[in-house]
Amino acid sequence: MTERNIAIEAANRDAVEDQRVEIVERKGIGHPDSICDGIAETVSRALSQLYLDRVGHVLHYNTDETQLVAGESIPDFDGGEVVEPIYILIVGRATKKYNGQRLPVDSTAVSAARTYLRENIPALTLGTDVIVDVRLGQGSGDLKDVFGENNVEIPMANDTSFGVGHAPLTETEKIVQAVEMQLNGPYADNHPVIGPDIKVMGKRENNSIDITVAAAMIDRYVADLEDYADAIENIRAFVTDVAHRHTNREVTVAVNTADDYDTGSIYLTVTGTSAEMGDDGSVGRGNRANGLITPNRPMSMEATSGKNPVNHIGKIYNLLSTDIAESVVADVDGIRDLQIRLLSQIGRPIDEPHIADAKIVTESNVNLQAIEPEIRAIIDNRLADVTSITERVINDELTTF
């Protein structure tokens, strides 16, 4: 056991599962904020791979300021058109020259972004429905120094910041996550009428769970208002079934609640994303590192996507804290609710946080002191293995939104 500063104490609150009101949100992969997160992270991995291939190690960069400016569209039954394209600007810092070698950073970034859009928002036509641009400046000199060289075994923190994570997920969290992933997975495969811009909001009040879904419907697959209404009802029934796989509580599902059938005002799109019709996007405005927005729990405001995976605390500590929480809950019996907070200090090795704080709600028959040594050992071991987070991120084994 090392001398890392690890604090473990009982949480002075009820477990989130036992609180009267719980709110959970997830923005789907086609939401404008998620599009920015996805592009930023895809570009990040592409740049990491470029640097590894060309110079043998990851150089200083960040792409976590990527922005989306919404377009304008005229959706219509059986197919409308985009009249003003979506504009996506990949923004950040990157090392473009190393030891006299010029590196194709901008072209790598644009290529990665276009590939991501083709794979995840297939109804978008590149060049006409969406334009991808890039502005990557040089990095700050002092931060490049903190970033260090390839022979540094444990990188130094690039910032004084923190990351948070929790486990296990509540029933409401599981439902919200599963609903979006199922709609944007198997359901969309069989029902192309639903676009990837899906937002799911869950509200639990005591033992009643309300799920509200906003789903962008693709106009070319909708013949008329009756056809649209049938598609919405199919989604509602599917979501209800998914929710009941995760809870025995009462569940109510509503889909596209702003629709007004009397006036014909419905959530119809050309491409399956609200980005085509006035909804802008930014990195870090959507899901946290575990894929959820959870106002009942502490959250970091850091944008995880697009940050450098070597020493950027806003990425590493948010992913690591979640990994620690999940590892502890998986290996230690009797934990009902666990919150992990990791705080860095700029220039300090990332495996030695300023503090690693664990707040725990145990089952009623479990004494925290009895399980504390096991919890401490897991936290210490995961911190010692912090550099594995970098490899897992580059290999696309960890999601950031």
Curated annotation (Swiss-Prot):
ATP binds at residues 137-142. Its EC number is 2.5.1.6. It comes from the Archaea. Keywords: ATP-binding, Magnesium, Nucleotide-binding, One-carbon metabolism, Transferase. The keyword Magnesium applies. Disulfide bonds: none annotated. Signal peptide: none annotated. It comes from Haloquadratum walsbyi (strain DSM 16790 / HBSQ001). This is S-adenosylmethionine synthase. PANTHER family: S-ADENOSYLMETHIONINE SYNTHASE. GO terms for biological process: one-carbon metabolic process; S-adenosylmethionine biosynthetic process. Its cofactor is Mg(2+). It catalyses: L-methionine + ATP + H2O = S-adenosyl-L-methionine + phosphate + diphosphate. Belongs to the AdoMet synthase 2 family.
